[in-house]
Amino acid sequence: MQLKNPILGLCQQATFMLSAAKVDQCPDDEGFEVAFAGRSNAGKSSALNTLTHASLARTSKTPGRTQLLNFFKLDDDRRLVDLPGYGYAKVPIPLKQHWQRHLEAYLGSRESLKGLILMMDIRHPMTDFDLLMLDWAVASGMPMHILLTKADKLTYGAAKNTLLKVQSQIRKGWGEAVTIQLFSAPKRMGLEEAYTVLAGWMELADKGAEAEA
């Protein structure tokens, strides 16, 4: 019998918990959280919705509409967090600065945060925002996994070449700790690999092994 990834059922039952403008409005800091970050228009909300098989994360034709930390409950101990998108020119500078302060406070203080999924548009990877997130994750010892989103926008060969190029750049600058994969929400490409990362961070891998038959 083929194993069913243990995180899949939890993601499919994900429900919205709350939105927080600052850290003291977040849920109790216990259990397991995985946060999703990405520059505006990197496909973050689409990736979250595909992973949860639902329309949980807000999508918009205007990037940067997500201004809050949005928490989604998987079970009593596990949550996904949609972080504010950054970099869209139409967002006023004071609002960008407000987002940045509270994002830094969340990332720097959250004990339950077990890993960070960073979305990069495969056509425009390694932006200044991406480099800052990589620097922070490696310096703080936070596990990071990168989704090169919108991989369906390129031919498979071009997507694979970009993956190898970015992977090489990351290894040279940040070491082996950061992992990376191709991802496409509309084509459902890379789901199993992403689920495996989530299951490991949320300590569900052993439960998957128990289900083997």
From Swiss-Prot:
Keywords carried by this UniProt record: Cell cycle, Cell division, GTP-binding, Magnesium, Metal-binding, Nucleotide-binding, Septation
One Gene Ontology molecular-function label: metal ion binding
Domain EngB-type G residue range list: 30-204
Residue positions binding GTP: 38-45, 64-68, 82-85, 149-152, 182-185
Entries under Gene3D superfamilies matching the protein: P-loop containing nucleotide triphosphate hydrolases (3.40.50.300)
Protein name: Probable GTP-binding protein EngB
Origin species: Pseudomonas fluorescens (strain ATCC BAA-477 / NRRL B-23932 / Pf-5)
Cofactor field: Mg(2+)
Function, as annotated: Necessary for normal cell division and for the maintenance of normal septation.
Gene responsible for this protein: engB
Chain residues that bind Mg(2+): 45, 66
PANTHER family (alphabetical): ENGB-TYPE G DOMAIN-CONTAINING PROTEIN, MSS1/TRME-RELATED GTP-BINDING PROTEIN
